[in-house]
Amino acid sequence: MPRFPHPAPENLRRDARPLLGRTALVTGASRRDGIGYAVARRLAAYGAGVYLHHHVPHDAAQPWGADPEGPEGVAAGVREARTDPAAVVAHGPGDLTDPTAPAELVATAIAALGTGRLDILVANHALSGHDGALDRIDVAMLDAHWATDTRSVILLVQAYARLRAALPARPPGGRVLMLTSGQDLAGGMPGEMAYALAKGALASATRTLATSLADLAVTVNTVNPGPVDTGYLDGEAHDAVAARFPSGRWGMPDDPARLLTWLATDEARWVTGQVIDSEGGFRRG
């Protein structure tokens, strides 16, 4: 006989609010077209309080621009998804290339959420553009992507881990979720060398971070969302990418959000140290 019995029937039924009472920080949640917003909405729908980090100057400098309703409009959309009226949804800015910003952001989020702890960290932010192929990249490009896409994430995880370690007990539900890209699949990303290197570092660090945080009852996983329609392509280029999916459509922000939010629940408590591709069968070849 197994030492641990099978769950009772009532424990097999899915809870409609599996994250009730828990808190989350989602970085890079500054546009309603983005993955961060989709993740934040699902976290709120699952019962969690959510702090949204944004860096509007980055979006404003991109071809797609900043969200027309600004950070408060983004936060309002997340509040609409709440299933716990008492759950806090707050937001604030931060330039995570500043080495002091990650720890400050974690502390700010904890204060805003009001529970004295942070359960779920979703490192969704990334630098877009400012990149090129091997023969075009320079030191500034490499440093910019390293600072934003890799260093800031590790510093966020460090600050989160230190605060979890300081808690009087080991509360369940500790989660670190990172996002990578398709840099390790098929032909890689030769036109985005700096980005691929920086995101590849997160994929490589996933298992090491999972081992480092295991004694704090924290799981660590990374998701490659594949091509997601966040408004950065249109016309023939958009159609060409869509044709490479078996479904004939791009991934939508809520597609990876479903996986990321599930990984934050207790159903995923036995999953850690994994890099998961969520690409809808995208054909890279």
Task: Show where each model-derived region lies.
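Catalytic Tyr-X3-Lys loop
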Residues: 135-157, 177, 202, 247
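Conserved Rossmann-fold SDR core element
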Residues: 117-118, 203, 213-228, 271-278
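Short-chain dehydrogenase/reductase
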Residues: 2-116, 129-132, 136
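Conserved mid-core segment of classical short-chain dehydrogenase/reductases
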Residues: 64-72, 126-143, 162, 166-172, ...
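Amphipathic alpha-helical dimer-interface segment in Rossmann-like NAD(P)H-dependent oxidoreductases
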Residues: 110-111, 148-171, 210-211, 215, ...
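Catalytic loop of short-chain dehydrogenase/reductase
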Residues: 28, 32, 168-201, 206-215, ...
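A conserved structural motif in NAD(P)-dependent oxidoreductases
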Residues: 245-256, 267
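Short C-terminal tail/terminal secondary-structure segment
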Residues: 4-14, 239, 243-244, 261, ...
